[in-house]
Amino acid sequence: MMLPSPVTSTPFSVKDILNLEQQRHFHGAHLQAELEQHFHSAPCMLATAEGTQFSDAGEEDEEEEGEKLSYLNSLAAAEGHGDSGLCPQSYVHTVLRDACSGPKEQEEEVVSERSQKSCQLKKSLEAAGDCKTSEDGERPKPRSRRKPRVLFSQAQVFELERRFKQQRYLSAPEREHLASSLKLTSTQVKIWFQNRRYKCKRQRQDKSLELGTHAPPPPPRRVAVPVLVRDGKPCVTPSAQTYGSPYGVGAGAYSYNSFPAYGYGNSAAAAAAAAAAAAAAAAYSGSYGCAYPTGGGGGGGGTASAATTAMQPACSATGGGSFVNVSNLGGFGSGGGAQPLHQGAAAGSACTQGTLQGIRAW
């Protein structure tokens, strides 16, 4: 049986609603308020009733009222409700309270019966809940049974692995044929291939991660970049600049600037340059012959234009008969006359053999 707790809680809890003592105090206060209202109205009603009785009955009624008052005084003294100095009006109130207490007691009995029923219902619910929890604790929920795992034999696994190496994906007829040969179902073969493909994928990922973490990074590529400009000045001249080709031959190998520039001054450098040019021209052999005449010009007072005109060689092709004018490769001597490049001992003139290739026209 539940004991009422003296601690007051929120008015919305179940304990406050089902607490019998608080309900009784509440009903008692409510009844006292109603009785006080009746007590305030009772003296007036009693006075009017007594006035009518006194007017109607006369002296006999007065004697009866006196007997009633004496009876009330003796009843009050016997019960001991108050002091001996209380007025008769208070005893009237007690009598009226006793008269009115009948229906109120019935209401209290109904309320108490309802509260007892609610308490019994609550106890029964709690007991049922405790029984359920105990039953649940004793009897655990049955787990959903998993399908038994398919165990493949070594021969089946070997055959599946061999077929997987040959073909990672199987069509429906191929799957059916393989399953029938291995005494398996088509679904089992399909699931095995799916798991095997996923396993291969995971292995590749793990391997790539291991290589990425443990292996050193590859060295950076080095590309040769030619320096074209340094401090605002070109580093490679156009004549000496070489261009890459698939055969490894630069463009400078076919340069036509192999002959130095020639001047018309009276210096030893000009003579040395002329000798070098003659030696280079003699190195080439061809079908063209150049005859340089030995005609001399005037004295020291001759002009350069006259000497140039006198020193124009007459070159004739041995076979064709066409004439080609080639620039003079000789210099001018100190005497002012044109000096031949090559002089023979008998004829006084020499013909050099050369080709047009490698000789730059003047």
Swiss-Prot record:
| Compositional bias (Basic and acidic residues) | 132-141
**Where is it made, tissue-wise?**
Expressed in spleen and intestine. Also expressed in salivary gland and tongue.
Question: SMART domains recorded for this chain?
Answer: HOX (SM00389)
Keywords recorded for this protein, A-Z: Developmental protein, DNA-binding, Homeobox, Nucleus, Transcription, Transcription regulation
**Compartment(s):** Nucleus
Q: Which residues bind DNA?
A: 145-204
Q: Which GO terms describe its biological process?
A: B cell differentiation; CD4-positive, alpha-beta T cell differentiation; cell fate specification; digestive tract development; gene expression; gland morphogenesis; immune response; leukocyte homeostasis
* CDD domains found in the cross-reference section: homeodomain (cd00086)
State the superkingdom. Answer: Eukaryota
Single GO cellular component annotation? nucleus
Q: Name one Pfam family in it.
A: Homeodomain
**Region of interest (Disordered), ranges:** 126-149, 203-222
Entry GO MF terms: DNA-binding transcription factor activity, RNA polymerase II-specific; sequence-specific double-stranded DNA binding
Please tell me whether the keyword Transcription is annotated for this protein: yes
What is the purpose of this protein?
A: Transcriptional regulator essential for normal development and functions of the small intestine and spleen. Activates directly MADCAM1 expression. Required for homing of lymphocytes in spleen and mucosa-associated lymphoid tissue. May have a role during pharyngeal organogenesis.
Name the protein family. Belongs to the NK-2 homeobox family.
Q: What is this protein called?
A: Homeobox protein Nkx-2.3
Species of origin: Mus musculus
Name of the gene this protein is made from = Nkx2-3
